[in-house]
């Protein structure tokens, strides 16, 4: 009896003609070989035949279609990057500074009114178990140059660790004794996380006397002149709702991972934020280092925790109300980059999942809005959301980490040189403009960004389809000076599960296999990229990135 009796029940005549039609482009010997393999009792031969059929009918056509799709996305992304580069070049060449387009006058004491001529400003500092950085951030906020009777420092502490909460309270009491108008606010719960804390902070009675609110995360240290540089724009330009400053990183040189993060974020601020501000007066609020007009914030519905990007959510809703934003590139606020890989992964998950989920929830409102021009809607939906928050992540992982390596295994699937090499190189060089002094790290940055693309692709799917950890909010760990002072214990025996990321290792193995296959059977030099990229995935997969901080060394 045949080991595969089901094959003998198939209509052999029909199937034979099908095989012949598939192989008609080949020789008659090939066709006969196909038929003989099908009629054979050898299970290996039949499996091989079925694979050849599936490869010819399904796999290769699918990959060819995906390559075409990726080529289209590559061109779209290149055009987007070129457009942003041209805008920034125009802004730089013609020195189109904010002061040229928005009225700005320095704040001075009125002879008759004195400090009463200054508007009331609320400074909010949300915190959660951040004892390593709370003192420096509170101190920086309390040193802001502004009349003491026209500013309120509001520390919103959601800490669950008694030691952290006590330290924050002591710091607030210390500055209060020095004459600073500072309040220490706590909640019974953490509903809404950061958005919930900010929302509760705005409900206090003393906030009603304030005109503007400046927001700084716990690791941010504004310069004393921060309000003097931002508030005048809001005073003299009633259509402005937000003035955003740029992040500057005090620990950028701490390790390779922080240097690579600095490159990405420098591009975000130098190019993306500046383009949005210069063209459509719209960009995503960065959640910190910015000043809001309180009336605009309230008119837009206040803080909403429907997504994990409450800052971007508020920016979109304010724009739909007709408000404008201003970004000041040379207004730098010191902050800290995540130096542990665990913290970076949590941050990148939130920064990718949140915008995708926000697009899902707000796209309809953007389209229907009557306060936004057609071109601005196009910019918001296409450039801001679709290209930068969706296509960029899909293209990076699917094309460069899955489809391009697969062309080694399927020679029938070809990728033009301009798409495989020239276009990505141009895009990378354009992105590198944001941080020219780090251009020598460009190759490492490309490999690291590709390795991180798997995490971002997963987060993107969660956000778009609202599944899994779509509402997960993990506060990015800040270490302040603890690494320098060695307050974090060195733990030589690290638990394996804390470091290993299985999916990254699987992708690394896939790339390694493709690279070796290309060396043995290939006719190009794609293996050079594949082998280096596989190493990057293995490094990320085994957690050999950044400063390792054991879970027991900081508070969750």
UniProtKB/Swiss-Prot annotation:
Enzyme nomenclature, EC number: 2.4.1.32
Main subcellular location of this protein, as a coarse class: Golgi
Domain of life the protein comes from: Eukaryota
Subcellular location: Golgi apparatus membrane
Active site per database record: 158, 311
Residue stretches spanning the membrane: 58-78, 390-410, 426-448, 502-522, 526-546
Disruption phenotype: Embryonic lethality when homozygous due to defective pollen tube growth and disruption of embryonic development.
GO biological process: cell wall organization; embryo development ending in seed dormancy; pollen tube growth
Tissues of expression: Ubiquitous.
GO cellular component terms given for this protein: Golgi membrane
Enzyme class: transferase
Catalysis performed (reactions): GDP-mannose + (glucomannan)n = GDP + (glucomannan)n+1
Keywords, ordered alphabetically: Cell wall biogenesis/degradation, Glycosyltransferase, Golgi apparatus, Membrane, Transferase, Transmembrane, Transmembrane helix
Cell membrane keyword on record: no
Residue runs in coiled coils: none
UniProt: substrate binding residues: 217, 219
Membrane topology of this protein: Multi-pass membrane protein
Alphabetized Pfam families for the sequence: Glyco_trans_2_3
Keyword Transferase: yes
Molecular function GO labels: glucomannan 4-beta-mannosyltransferase activity; mannan synthase activity
Family designation: Belongs to the glycosyltransferase 2 family. Plant cellulose synthase-like A subfamily.
PANTHER family documented for this protein: GLUCOMANNAN 4-BETA-MANNOSYLTRANSFERASE 7, GLUCOMANNAN 4-BETA-MANNOSYLTRANSFERASE 9
Function: Probable mannan synthase which consists of a 4-beta-mannosyltransferase activity on mannan using GDP-mannose. The beta-1,4-mannan product is the backbone for galactomannan synthesis by galactomannan galactosyltransferase. Galactomannan is a noncellulosic polysaccharides of plant cell wall. Required for synthesis of a cell wall polysaccharide essential for pollen tube growth, for cell wall structure, or for signaling during plant embryo development.
Full protein name: Glucomannan 4-beta-mannosyltransferase 7
Native species: Arabidopsis thaliana
């Amino acid at each position: 009896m045949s080991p595969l009796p089901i094959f003998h029940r198939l209509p052999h005549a029909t199937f034979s003609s099908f095989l012949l039609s598939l192989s008609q482009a080949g020789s008659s010997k090939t066709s006969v070989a196909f038929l003989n393999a099908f009629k054979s009792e050898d299970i290996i031969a039949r499996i091989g035949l079925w694979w050849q059929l599936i490869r010819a009918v399904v796999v290769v056509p699918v990959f060819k279609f995906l390559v075409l799709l990726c080529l289209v996305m590559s061109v779209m992304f290149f055009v987007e990057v070129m457009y942003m580069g041209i805008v920034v070049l125009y802004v730089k060449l013609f020195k189109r500074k904010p002061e040229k387009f928005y009225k700005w006058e320095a704040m001075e004491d009125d002879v008759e009114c004195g400090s009463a001529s200054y508007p009331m400003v609320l400074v909010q500092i949300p915190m959660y178990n951040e004892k390593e950085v709370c003192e420096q951030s509170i101190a920086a906020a309390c040193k802001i140059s502004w009349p003491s009777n026209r500013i309120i420092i509001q520390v919103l502490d959601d800490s669950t660790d008694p030691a952290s909460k006590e330290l924050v309270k002591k710091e607030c009491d210390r500055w209060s004794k020095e004459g600073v108008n500072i309040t220490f606010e706590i909640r019974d719960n953490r509903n809404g996380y950061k958005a919930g804390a900010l929302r509760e902070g705005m409900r206090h009675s003393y906030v009603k006397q304030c005109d503007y609110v400046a927001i700084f995360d716990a690791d941010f240290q504004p310069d004393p002149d921060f309000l003097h540089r931002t508030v005048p724009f809001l005073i003299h330009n009633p259509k402005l709702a937000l003035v955003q400053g740029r992040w500057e990183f005090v620990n950028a040189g701490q390790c390779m991972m922080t240097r690579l993060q600095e490159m990405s974020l420098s591009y975000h601020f130098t190019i993306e934020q500046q383009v949005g501000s210069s063209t459509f007066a719209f960009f995503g609020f960065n959640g910190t280092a910015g000043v809001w007009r309180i009336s605009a914030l309230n008119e837009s519905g206040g803080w909403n925790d429907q997504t994990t990007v409450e800052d971007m959510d508020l920016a979109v809703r304010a724009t739909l109300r007709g408000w404008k934003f201003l970004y000041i590139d040379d207004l730098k606020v010191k902050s800290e980059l995540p130096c542990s890989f665990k913290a970076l992964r949590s941050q990148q998950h939130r920064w990718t999942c949140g915008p995708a989920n926000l697009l899902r929830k707000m796209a309809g409102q953007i389209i229907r809005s009557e306060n936004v021009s057609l071109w601005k809607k196009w910019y918001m939906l296409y450039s801001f959301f679709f290209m930068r928050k969706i296509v960029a992540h899909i293209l990076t992982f699917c094309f460069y980490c899955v489809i391009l390596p697969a062309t080694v295994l399927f020679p029938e699937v070809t990728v033009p040189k301009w798409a495989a090499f020239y276009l990505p190189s141009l895009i990378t060089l354009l992105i590198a403009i944001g941080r020219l002094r780090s251009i020598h790290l460009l190759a490492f940055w490309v490999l690291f960004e590709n390795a991180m693309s798997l995490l971002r692709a997963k987060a993107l799917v969660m956000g778009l389809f609202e599944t899994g950890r779509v509402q997960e909010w993990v506060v990015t760990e800040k270490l302040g000076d603890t690494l320098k002072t060695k307050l974090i214990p060195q733990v030589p025996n690290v638990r394996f599960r804390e470091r290993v990321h299985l999916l990254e290792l699987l992708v690394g193995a896939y790339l390694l296999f493709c690279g070796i296959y290309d060396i043995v059977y290939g006719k190009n030099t794609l293996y050079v990229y594949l082998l280096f990229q596989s190493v990057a995935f293995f490094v990320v997969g085994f957690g050999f990135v950044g400063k390792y901080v054991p879970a027991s060394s900081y508070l969750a």
